[in-house]
A protein has these predicted regions:
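Signature of N-terminal electron-transfer/Fe-S-associated modules in redox systems
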Residues: 1-155
């Protein structure tokens, strides 16, 4: 676990790197997440003060964009498409299978810390649905057997 001094130091370095940038909040949040693997709650008031925003404004942006994490992810991130096109070809069944196989729900990480399961909306692979992203790599035509193979490769 990171201490508040380390968080403050690293966040201030990121803020300084974005000085003078127009509309820096999103790039700052992305940089913090790239550095920490998530955006620590302790970073929000530091960002707010530096950008002359309220904490609510910073939190609002954080919560609006689904890719920002408030907690560290597992070693691997499995994202399953939840858009209508994928749902029409079995994404709900695939999602239920993945949740059961991993023993977790959406936005949770397995007890061993290896896999985080997240919903994502439209990956642009509609013709190859159900679709997924495994550690940033797109995967199409995902079914229960493919989910089992993916999960097996992540553990």
């Amino acid at each position: 676990m990171l201490d508040s001094v380390e968080i403050t130091t690293r966040v201030e370095e990121i803020l300084n790197a974005h000085k003078g940038m127009e509309g820096p909040l999103l790039p700052i949040l992305h940089a913090i997440q790239a550095d920490f693997g998530y955006v620590p709650q302790a970073a929000l008031p530091i960002i707010a003060q530096d950008l002359n925003l309220s904490r609510a404004e910073v939190h609002g942006v954080m919560s609006f964009y689904h890719d920002f994490r408030e907690d560290p992810a597992g070693n691997h991130v499995l994202k399953l498409c939840r858009a209508e096109s994928c749902q029409s070809v079995g994404a709900d069944r695939v999602a239920a299978h993945a949740q059961k196989a991993l023993g977790i729900e959406w936005h949770e990480t397995t007890k061993d810390g290896k896999v985080t399961l997240e919903p994502v909306f439209c990956l642009g692979l509609c013709a190859c649905g159900p679709a997924a992203i495994v550690d940033g790599k797109l995967v199409g035509r995902v079914d229960e057997a493919r989910i089992d193979a993916i999960i097996g490769g992540l553990k």
